[in-house]
Amino acid sequence: MAAGPRTSVLLAFTLLCLPWPQEAGAFPAMPLSSLFANAVLRAQHLHQLAADTYKEFERTYIPEGQRYSIQNAQAAFCFSETIPAPTGKDEAQQRSDVELLRFSLLLIQSWLGPVQFLSRVFTNSLVFGTSDRVYEKLKDLEEGIQALMRELEDGSPRAGQILRQTYDKFDTNLRSDDALLKNYGLLSCFKKDLHKAETYLRVMKCRRFVESSCAF
């Protein structure tokens, strides 16, 4: 699987240049509606970033004829598929806000280690050397979710009740087909997990604060 020419490669990371509502770690006392709004916006940014990165990696490294068969095998690769987390909006609406926050926290924390190796996956470090910023944004979202948990649980988040897991780090040996497939699978899981976290946060925000943007 030889690397092909990259087209519009910068698009994969344009969202990294967009301003965030506040700096990382900045979750002071504020209305619950603002906490939810900020967390949802952060999750949307990260989900779009994950989707763009996955798409760019696929275009660059995965032959088109192999994509369908590989994608069919990727669901079992994601450990998040083995936990009782809702798989979509309808299922999420059947869970309590505290449950959804705990699942969101689990998903975010499972990627804090692996994303620190993300920049090493790509040969063009000037473009993809942004792993630290992705990590910072994940930490920022983690803190936002923990702030929401403190508000809703009336105390500190009970992290001990969440089974913490993590994914393997990305493989830097891009000359190996096995490494390429591993990274492709990891990026697929990253995209899926960020989509789940975004969905959970949007469901919670919408049912607490009725608004026109609840249709998604």
Swiss-Prot record:
It is found in: Secreted. Residues 1-26 form the signal peptide. Its main location: secreted. Coiled coil: none annotated. Keywords: Disulfide bond, Hormone, Metal-binding, Phosphoprotein, Secreted, Signal, Zinc. InterPro entries: 4_helix_cytokine-like_core, Somatotropin, Somatotropin/Prolactin, Somatotropin_CS. The modification Phosphoserine is found at residue 131. Disulfide bonds join 78-189, 206-214. The keyword Zinc applies. Zn(2+) binds at residues 45, 198. One of its GO terms (cellular component) is secretory granule. One of its GO terms (biological process) is positive regulation of multicellular organism growth. One of its GO terms (molecular function) is hormone activity. CDD domains: somatotropin_like. PROSITE patterns: SOMATOTROPIN_1 (PS00266), SOMATOTROPIN_2 (PS00338). The keyword Secreted applies. Belongs to the somatotropin/prolactin family. Plays an important role in growth control. Its major role in stimulating body growth is to stimulate the liver and other tissues to secrete IGF1. It stimulates both the differentiation and proliferation of myoblasts. It also stimulates amino acid uptake and protein synthesis in muscle and other tissues. This is Somatotropin. It comes from Camelus dromedarius (Dromedary). The lineage of its organism: Eukaryota, Metazoa, Chordata, Craniata, Vertebrata. The gene is GH1.
